Curated annotation (Swiss-Prot):
It comes from Staphylococcus aureus (strain MRSA252). Its EC number is 1.4.4.2. GO terms for molecular function: glycine binding; glycine dehydrogenase (decarboxylating) activity; pyridoxal phosphate binding. This is Probable glycine dehydrogenase (decarboxylating) subunit 2. InterPro entries: Aminotrans_V_dom, GcvPB, GDC-P_C, GDC_P, PyrdxlP-dep_Trfase, PyrdxlP-dep_Trfase_major, PyrdxlP-dep_Trfase_small. The keyword Lipid metabolism does not apply. The glycine cleavage system is composed of four proteins: P, T, L and H. In this organism, the P 'protein' is a heterodimer of two subunits.
C-alpha cells in the first residue's frame, strides 16, 4: 500500500501556536480544583493539536477536496438511495427562526417549528397509509428498534409476552436482526424462493405461537417486489403476529402503493434517504415511525398535536414506550424533508419512483450480457448482479469495485445481500441523467473486459486514489484507531 494522504492535524501541531486571539480576562476566576471534585479533574494535560488558523483552514480544505459525495460524482450505493439533495432544502434549514431556536423554549415561542413537525407527521401519514407517526427516532435502525419496542409492549399488554420471535428474510438488511436482538427478540430466518421473494412454504413452517412480527422491505433488498405480500400478511396476522415495514426502499413505490394498504402495522422511513436529507457522513439522520391506530397509544412521547390554532406537545399517551430521543429528534432533517415533499407534491413523488425504477431497469438490461443476473424479472429501484463470470479469470467483485474508483464512480454495495454470490447491488436513484448512467454502464463493461483480457490491471486497482490497494487483512487484525497508536507504530 502506498499513500498520498495528508498529515493528521496532530502531526501539524506545534507547541505555542493558536488559532484564536482573546483579550486577557478582567473577570475574577476560580480554580478548577475549587469547582470540581478531584475525581473529575484530569491528571494529565489534554493532547489537543496546536495550529494556527491558516494551517487549520488549509488542513480541512485539503481533506474536503479529497472527499467524494453525490455533489461531485455518481454514487450508486445499493440500498442507500444516494440521490441529489436539493439546495433549497439547505436554504430553508438555515432560516434563522428555525436554526436559532432552542428545544427548551416555551411552546408559544416555537409555534413555527412545532407546525413543521405536525405538518410533516401528517404528510408521512398520507404517504405511508399509517394512522399516526412519530418523528423522534434518529435513524433507520433506531426506527426499527422503536417499532419493535412498540410491538413488544403491545403483545405484553395483551397478555402475550411469550411472543419472542421476529421473522427476518435471508435477504434482509443486517439492521433487522440486530434491532430484533437489541429489542429482546430472537431472529428466525425465512428463506427466499427462486424468484428472490419470501418462500411462502418456508414462512408457514417458521410461523408459530411465539411469532411477534415479521420484518419486511418491499421491494426487498434484491430490488424485487414481494407480490405475495397480502398472503404473507394473512399468514402472520392469523398467527397473532404483526407486520413491520422497513422503509429503506420506499423510494421505489411512492404514490404507487402504501405500506398501510399492504397490511403493515408499523413502518419506519429514512428521511435522510427517500426525502433528501444529506447522508453518507455518519449523520444526522431521521427514522420516523408510523403505526396503525391499534398501536398509536404505544408511540413514544411527547407527540406534537394541533389544539385549535396552536401546536403543542402531548405527553398524555396511555401506553407510551417513553421518550426514545432527547428533545424531539433531529429537527434540521425534518425541515429538509418537509421542503422536499412540499416542493415535489404527490405527482412529483410519483415521478421520483417511476424514474428510479426506470433507471435501475435500464442499467440492468444493458449489463445483462456482460454479468450474471441471478433474478431475471423486472426490478424496482435497485438490482443485484453477480461477478461469478469474472471470478473465472481470478477477478472478484471487490476488485471491480476498486477499479471503479479510478473512473470517478463510487462503487455499488458489494457482497450484500448474502444470498447472491459475488453480489453487486446497484441503485442509481431518480436524479441521474441517461448520460451518467451510460458512463457507468460503459465503465463496468470495460472493467469486465479488463477482467477477461488483463486481469492484473483490475487486481492492482485503484491507481488514482489517495490510498491505493489496502492491506485489508492487516487493517482488520491490527487497527490503528488513535494517534497514540500511530506514534507507537512509527
Amino acid at each position: 500500500m502506498t499513500s498520498k494522504s495528508s498529515p493528521l492535524i496532530f502531526e501539524r501541531s506545534r507547541e505555542g501556536r493558536y488559532a484564536y486571539s482573546l483579550p486577557i480576562s478582567d473577570i475574577k476566576t476560580n480554580s478548577v480544583e475549587s469547582l470540581l471534585d478531584d475525581k473529575f479533574i484530569r491528571k494529565n494535560k489534554a493532547e489537543f493539536p496546536e495550529v494556527a488558523e491558516l494551517d487549520l483552514v488549509r488542513h480541512y480544505t485539503e481533506l474536503s477536496n479529497k472527499n467524494f459525495g453525490v455533489d461531485n460524482g455518481f454514487y450508486p450505493l445499493g440500498s442507500c438511495t444516494m440521490k441529489y439533495n436539493p439546495k433549497i432544502n439547505e436554504k430553508v434549514a438555515r432560516i434563522p427562526g428555525f436554526s436559532e431556536s432552542h428545544p427548551l423554549q416555551d411552546e408559544d415561542q416555537v409555534q413555527g417549528s412545532l407546525e413543521i413537525i405536525y405538518s410533516l407527521q401528517e404528510e408521512l401519514k398520507e404517504i405511508t397509509g399509517m394512522d399516526e407517526v412519530t418523528l423522534q427516532p434518529a435513524a433507520g435502525a433506531h426506527g426499527e428498534w422503536t417499532a419493535l419496542m412498540i410491538f413488544k409492549a403491545y403483545h405484553e399488554n395483551n397478555g402475550e409476552g411469550h411472543r419472542d420471535e421476529v421473522i427476518v428474510p435471508d435477504s434482509a438488511h443486517g439492521t433487522n436482526p440486530a434491532s430484533a436482538s437489541f429489542a429482546g427478540f430472537k431472529s428466525v430466518t425465512v428463506k427466499s424462493n427462486e424468484r428472490g421473494e419470501v418462500d411462502i412454504d418456508d414462512l408457514k413452517r417458521v410461523v408459530n405461537e411465539n411469532t411477534a412480527a415479521i420484518m419486511l422491505t418491499n421491494p426487498n433488498t434484491l430490488g424485487i417486489f414481494e407480490k405475495n405480500i397480502m398472503e404473507i400478511r394473512e399468514i402472520v396476522h392469523n398467527a397473532g403476529g404483526l407486520l413491520y415495514y422497513d422503509g429503506a426502499n420506499l423510494n421505489a413505490i411512492m404514490d404507487k402503493v402504501r405500506p398501510g394498504d399492504m397490511g403493515f402495522d408499523a413502518v419506519h422511513l429514512n428521511l435522510h434517504k427517500t426525502f433528501t436529507g444529506p447522508h453518507g457522513g455518519g449523520g444526522p439522520g431521521s427514522g420516523p415511525v408510523g403505526v396503525v391506530k391499534e398501536l398509536a397509544s404505544y408511540l413514544p412521547k411527547p407527540m406534537v398535536i394541533k389544539d385549535g390554532d396552536k401546536f403543542k406537545y402531548d405527553n398524555d399517551i396511555k401506553n407510551s414506550i417513553g421518550r426514545v430521543k432527547p428533545f424531539y429528534g433531529n429537527f434540521g432533517i425534518y425541515l429538509r424533508a418537509y421542503t422536499y415533499i412540499r416542493t415535489m407534491g404527490a405527482t412529483g413523488l410519483k415521478e421520483v419512483s417511476e424514474a428510479a425504477v426506470l433507471n435501475a431497469n435500464y442499467i440492468k438490461a444493458r449489463l445483462s450480457e456482460h454479468f450474471e443476473i441471478p433474478y431475471k424479472q423486472y426490478c424496482k429501484h435497485e438490482f443485484v448482479l453477480s461477478g461469478v463470470r469474472q471470478k473465472e479469470f481470478g477477478v472478484r467483485t471487490l476488485d471491480m469495485a476498486k477499479r471503479l474508483l479510478d473512473f470517478g464512480v463510487h462503487p455499488p454495495t458489494i457482497y450484500f445481500p448474502l444470498n447472491v454470490e459475488e453480489g453487486m447491488m446497484i441503485e442509481p436513484t431518480e436524479t441521474e441523467s441517461k448520460e451518467t448512467l451510460d458512463y457507468f454502464i460503459d465503465t463496468l463493461i470495460s472493467i469486465a473486459e479488463e477482467a477477461k483480457n488483463d486481469p492484473d490491471k483490475v487486481l492492482e486497482a485503484p491507481y488514482t486514489t489517495v490510498i491505493d490497494r489496502l492491506d485489508e487483512a492487516t487493517a482488520a487484525r491490527k487497527p490503528i484507531l488513535k494517534f497514540e497508536n500511530l506514534k507507537q507504530e512509527k
